[in-house]
Amino acid sequence: MDSRSPSLPDDRPDPPEQHLDARAGATLRGTAGPRGVRRILPFLGPAVIASIAYMDPGNFATNIEGGARYGYSLLWVILAANLMAMVIQNLSANLGIASGRNLPELIRERWPRPLVWFYWIQAELVAMATDLAEFLGAALAIQLLTGLPMFWGAVVTGVVTFWLLNLQKRGTRPLELAVGAFVLMIGVAYLVQVVLARPDLAAVGAGFVPRLQGPGSAYLAVGIIGATVMPHVIYLHSALTQGRIQTDTTEEKRRLVRLNRVDVIAAMGLAGLINMSMLAVAAATFHGKNVENAGDLTTAYQTLTPLLGPAASVLFAVALLASGLSSSAVGTMAGDVIMQGFMGFHIPLWLRRLITMLPAFIVILLGMDPSSVLILSQVILCFGVPFALVPLLLFTARRDVMGALVTRRSFTVIGWVIAVIIIALNGYLLWELLGG
């Protein structure tokens, strides 16, 4: 059986890289190997790539609007959403490790062909819609930083994402490190913004006490939690862990699952802190100051300068750029996994990147509002959530798929509770968006 991740086509070197596999193998076998933090470094990476989807331009808009309108009161919602995401992404990663298959492959192998075709079409549409919003977010950030028209910002975005995707020719690790650098860039930018904004620490603490301030905050809370699960990275995460590190025994797989849990908690925890920082900065800067339409990214950028100084605006745009570039590249990777998994074939990543860029250029040339496109992508995302969640929970609970690493019944119940909550909230959000 070929255990390579389908996100890495045949013309690239077989992952994982030899040095990564050697260090990881020593740890998994319990033989002499790296100690301390160095011991877990080979196992960090897949969740970092997946986590960037939780810091995409859509999250910027939602978090900024939440902080501007309701202060710190929705911090508890971000915390709850992040904990849910940890559970779901951990299940996805475990599926790839335990089964040697990714989620689209398992659906193709075990479900009727007509259903597989339906799954492929809806998953491709969700991935492309998500990528559209992320691509436009990066192009907008370039426009804010340089004054270039959106069209040329999109051209630069395309070139940089081509470069990012090309890193896979050198194996999985370079791409993991590059995406990790973008995550670090976003984190540092928001850490400095927190220092500049000086949020009220007592109010921040009170924000973790569950409460809602009327129907408006309830709707925004639904939007934050409803968008917790990103369908395309559920498919992708199971492929990123699939065959990344070679295991020879069930016990080695158990150890790999435990170490992978560290990867998920660390990466998703950092993503959660960054999202909380976004909301806290918006609350400290915009709340109570009659800033209209603060959720619009351009408005947020322009308003930061008079309130916190030009450095805050530049840092905001840099963070948005890092978010858009990396999440757009990850979206293209997810589309590659989706096609290979569901259909059994792939097109070159450069061709897929060209195809998925076209909608963004059309939107720009037509002069459409990027914020409106973000809302449209959210509607399409809502459609895709149950189609990724349900098979994930079904397969991870099956012993014939997971073997000895089948998910414990109590954890499966938690997963289904989370799934029901997220699917219900997405249904409500979808109804509201379409009704509006």
From Swiss-Prot:
<keyword id="KW-0812">Transmembrane</keyword>
<comment type="similarity">
    <text>Belongs to the NRAMP family.</text>
</comment>
<feature type="transmembrane region" description="Helical">
    <location>
        <begin position="304"/>
        <end position="324"/>
    </location>
</feature>
<keyword id="KW-0406">Ion transport</keyword>
<dbReference type="GO" id="GO:0006828">
    <property type="term" value="P:manganese ion transport"/>
</dbReference>
<keyword id="KW-0769">Symport</keyword>
<feature type="transmembrane region" description="Helical">
    <location>
        <begin position="264"/>
        <end position="284"/>
    </location>
</feature>
<dbReference type="GO" id="GO:0005384">
    <property type="term" value="F:manganese ion transmembrane transporter activity"/>
</dbReference>
<feature type="transmembrane region" description="Helical">
    <location>
        <begin position="115"/>
        <end position="135"/>
    </location>
</feature>
<comment type="function">
    <text>H(+)-stimulated, divalent metal cation uptake system.</text>
</comment>
<keyword id="KW-1003">Cell membrane</keyword>
<dbReference type="GO" id="GO:0034755">
    <property type="term" value="P:iron ion transmembrane transport"/>
</dbReference>
<dbReference type="GO" id="GO:0015086">
    <property type="term" value="F:cadmium ion transmembrane transporter activity"/>
</dbReference>
<keyword id="KW-0472">Membrane</keyword>
<dbReference type="InterPro" id="IPR001046">
    <property type="entry name" value="NRAMP_fam"/>
</dbReference>
<feature type="transmembrane region" description="Helical">
    <location>
        <begin position="216"/>
        <end position="236"/>
    </location>
</feature>
<feature type="transmembrane region" description="Helical">
    <location>
        <begin position="144"/>
        <end position="164"/>
    </location>
</feature>
<dbReference type="GO" id="GO:0015293">
    <property type="term" value="F:symporter activity"/>
</dbReference>
<feature type="region of interest" description="Disordered">
    <location>
        <begin position="1"/>
        <end position="31"/>
    </location>
</feature>
<feature type="transmembrane region" description="Helical">
    <location>
        <begin position="411"/>
        <end position="431"/>
    </location>
</feature>
<feature type="compositionally biased region" description="Basic and acidic residues">
    <location>
        <begin position="1"/>
        <end position="22"/>
    </location>
</feature>
<dbReference type="GO" id="GO:0005886">
    <property type="term" value="C:plasma membrane"/>
</dbReference>
<feature type="transmembrane region" description="Helical">
    <location>
        <begin position="375"/>
        <end position="395"/>
    </location>
</feature>
<feature type="transmembrane region" description="Helical">
    <location>
        <begin position="354"/>
        <end position="374"/>
    </location>
</feature>
<dbReference type="GO" id="GO:0046872">
    <property type="term" value="F:metal ion binding"/>
</dbReference>
<protein>
    <recommendedName>
        <fullName>Divalent metal cation transporter MntH</fullName>
    </recommendedName>
</protein>
<dbReference type="Pfam" id="PF01566">
    <property type="entry name" value="Nramp"/>
</dbReference>
<feature type="transmembrane region" description="Helical">
    <location>
        <begin position="177"/>
        <end position="197"/>
    </location>
</feature>
<feature type="transmembrane region" description="Helical">
    <location>
        <begin position="40"/>
        <end position="60"/>
    </location>
</feature>
<feature type="transmembrane region" description="Helical">
    <location>
        <begin position="71"/>
        <end position="91"/>
    </location>
</feature>
<keyword id="KW-0813">Transport</keyword>
<keyword id="KW-1133">Transmembrane helix</keyword>
